[in-house]
């Protein structure tokens, strides 16, 4: 007997589906793209069952298409997420996530002594991997931080 499967989150006609987001990260991704302030319909699935991750988050954003730059920012939070662009209920494009080399004016430097807290300069981080851990190095104070420390702020 074939196992029946049913979508736990309704399909969208046009927009972006971000799947395989690690559990507990979906809300952060939503805020990263400022979707919590959007007038478009956003469907959020939190702690959904996943054979690969155990549990995962999922975002479906109607009538919004994520560009390559946004996808690279997403890679900081969910490097193995899948991003599908949907048109007329069909996947028309899959965006591959790649870590950006630099991230500018997105995160605040965790170092309270960094010049970015007192001067009108945009934050800037170099992004790299070390032993499969994502690290960010501040352009100004040159301190290196684990991704979680920078993205939690």
UniProtKB/Swiss-Prot annotation:
- What SUPFAM superfamilies does the entry give? Aspartate carbamoyltransferase, Regulatory-chain, C-terminal domain, Aspartate carbamoyltransferase, Regulatory-chain, N-terminal domain
What does the entry give for GO biological process? Answer: 'de novo' pyrimidine nucleobase biosynthetic process; pyrimidine nucleotide biosynthetic process
The alphabetical list of record keywords is: Metal-binding, Pyrimidine biosynthesis, Zinc
- Per UniProt, Zn(2+) binds at 109, 114, 138, 141
Organism's domain of life? Bacteria
A GO molecular function term, named singly, is:
metal ion binding
Q: Entry cofactor note text?
A: Binds 1 zinc ion per subunit.
Which cofactors? Zn(2+)
Q: Which Pfam families does the UniProt record give?
A: PyrI (PF01948), PyrI_C (PF02748)
Looking up InterPro entries in the UniProt record yields: Asp_carbamoyltransf_reg_N, Asp_carbamoylTrfase_reg, Asp_carbamoyltrfase_reg_C, Asp_carbatrfase_reg_C_sf, Asp_carbatrfase_reg_N_sf
Q: Which GO terms describe its cellular component?
A: aspartate carbamoyltransferase complex
Q: How does it assemble?
A: Contains catalytic and regulatory chains.
State the similarity comment.
Belongs to the PyrI family.
Function, as annotated: Involved in allosteric regulation of aspartate carbamoyltransferase.
Q: What is this protein called?
A: Aspartate carbamoyltransferase regulatory chain
Q: Which organism is it from?
A: Vibrio campbellii (strain ATCC BAA-1116)
**Gene designation:** pyrI
């Amino acid at each position: 007997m074939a196992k029946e499967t049913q979508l736990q989150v309704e399909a969208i006609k046009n927009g972006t589906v971000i799947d395989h987001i690690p559990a507990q990260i979906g809300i952060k991704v939503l805020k990263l793209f400022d979707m919590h302030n959007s007038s478009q319909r956003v469907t959020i699935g939190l702690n959904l069952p996943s054979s690969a991750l155990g549990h995962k988050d999922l975002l479906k954003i109607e009538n919004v298409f994520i560009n390559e730059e946004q996808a690279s920012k997403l890679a900081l939070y969910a490097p193995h997420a899948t991003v599908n662009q949907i048109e007329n209920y069909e996947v028309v494009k899959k965006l591959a996530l790649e870590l950006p080399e630099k991230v500018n004016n997105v995160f605040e430097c965790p170092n309270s002594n960094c010049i970015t807290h007192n001067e009108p300069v945009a934050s800037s981080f170099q992004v790299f991997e070390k032993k499969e851990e994502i690290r960010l190095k501040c352009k100004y104070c040159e301190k290196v931080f684990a991704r979680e420390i920078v993205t939690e702020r």
